[in-house]
Amino acid sequence: MAEPLLVVGLGNPGENYARTRHNLGFMVADLLAARLGAKFKVHKRSGAEVVTGRLAQRSVVLAKPRCYMNESGRQVAPLAKFYSVPPADLIVIHDELDLDFGRIRLKFGGGEGGHNGLRSVAAALGTKNFQRVRIGIGRPPGRKDPATFVLENFSSPERPEVPTICEQAADATELLVEVGLEPAQNRVHAW
C-alpha cells in the first residue's frame, strides 16, 4: 500500500486571522476536511491539527499548522517524518501574491516568492521540491506593504467570490491527488 500524501493548508491561527488573505490555505483545508466528513484533531508529536482519510481513493493526511505562518515548517517537517511522507509527496496549499485574485495554479518546487510560510517549510524539509496549490490574491494596490495586505480581510468586492475560489482550490487539490501534477496542471490551468 502506498504511503499517504501530506496535504497542508497554510495560515495563521486565531479568530483575528480567520478571514484574511493569508488564511486561504486554512480555508481550503477546512473545506477538504468537511468533504471527508472529519474534524481536525491535534497531532501530539507535531502540534498541528490533522485529519486522516481518503481523497480520490488515495490515503491522505490533511494538516493545518497551529503555529504562525512564518514558523509552519516546524510543524510540517515532524508530520512528514511521522507519516513517512517524502517532500515530493507533500502538497502545500497557500495564498499567492504573484497570481491575480482567484487564479489557481499548481507547481512543483521553485522559489517561495517572498512567502514566509513556504520559506519555513522549505527550510525545515531541507528542500523546495514539494507540490503547491497556489491561490491568487493579487498584488496590493498602490504602495501598500504586501505584509500588511496579506493580513487584511478580503475587500467587499472580493468577499463574495472567496467561497467559490476555495471550492475550486479544493477541487484542484483533489485532482492533483487523483491524477498527479502534470495531468492536473493541464486541466486546472485551463480553468
Swiss-Prot record:
Q: Name one GO cellular component term.
A: cytoplasm
Keyword RNA-binding carried by entry: yes
Q: Please list the disulfide bridges.
A: none
Location, primary (coarse class) = cytoplasm
Pfam assignment, any one:
Pept_tRNA_hydro
Residues annotated to bind tRNA: 17, 68, 70, 116
Residue numbers marked as site, Discriminates between blocked and unblocked aminoacyl-tRNA? 12
Query: Which Gene Ontology BP annotations are present?
Result: protein quality control for misfolded or incompletely synthesized proteins; rescue of stalled ribosome
What EC number(s) does the entry state?
3.1.1.29
Which Gene Ontology terms cover its molecular function?
A: peptidyl-tRNA hydrolase activity; tRNA binding
Active-site residues?
Answer: 22 (proton acceptor)
Q: What PROSITE patterns does the annotation carry?
A: PEPT_TRNA_HYDROL_1, PEPT_TRNA_HYDROL_2
Q: Which CDD domains match?
A: PTH
Enzymatic reactions:
an N-acyl-L-alpha-aminoacyl-tRNA + H2O = an N-acyl-L-amino acid + a tRNA + H(+)
Keyword list, A-Z: Cytoplasm, Hydrolase, RNA-binding, tRNA-binding
Q: How does it assemble?
A: Monomer.
Q: Which family does it belong to?
A: Belongs to the PTH family.
Q: What is this protein called?
A: Peptidyl-tRNA hydrolase
